[in-house]
Amino acid sequence: MSKDLDNRYYISLNKDKIIFSCLNKENKISFTMSHILKNGLNNLFEDLEKFFIENLIDIEKSLKDFIKKIYIIFDIDNSLSAHLSIKYKLETEKINENKINELLTYIKNQFNKYSNDQKVIHMTVIRVLIDGKEKDLSLIRETADNLILEVKLECLKNQTVHLIKKLCSNYQISIEKILLANHLRHSYLHQTDNIVFSANKFLSGTSNNEVFWTTKKPIKYGFFEKFFNFFN
């Protein structure tokens, strides 16, 4: 029987090592295994494949489970950050979740149009201005003249995302989500030393200003979730 409902499986990739971790339903790391990168990030994907070849069967035996889904945490410095903003004249329209979704989708699509070698991993709403005044979106139900959204996008190269998805698929493993360690550390500063616990907090929806995309029914991610859930 699969234990996917009880466990979350993570692979953290940094310049020194590959770390596999199993986080159980008590939010404790019940299993971990690491692999030293002798050449740093130069042969990262070759080393990850070697890790799977040499260890995957033993890991599954130890866990008494087949690993079908996994979360990948990139703890590397070659991600791209971009700050973007959009100003929208509302005229007689009221600000609502549909309009916010529409504007955030437009920002993401425009970024993809001009940076098509990048994959957006994280999108965060930095600031919302209504008629020049900073507002909390969760409380807005009003008519205004203009709305300004400021967002931060954090990205990886499309090629990097494609390669790791393909590699995992060779072992019948699907990637649930790719995360960036620097983003997690910024979101949960000083709360934990282990990046896996930060990732789990993030996936549980405790980051109120994060924009989430999902292909499934929306999951509640705090009071911002009705504004910031998207469908591919």
Where are these regions (language model features)?
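Nucleotide/phosphate-binding catalytic cleft detector across ATP-hydrolyzing
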Residues: M1-K17, K25-S30, S34-F66, F74-N232
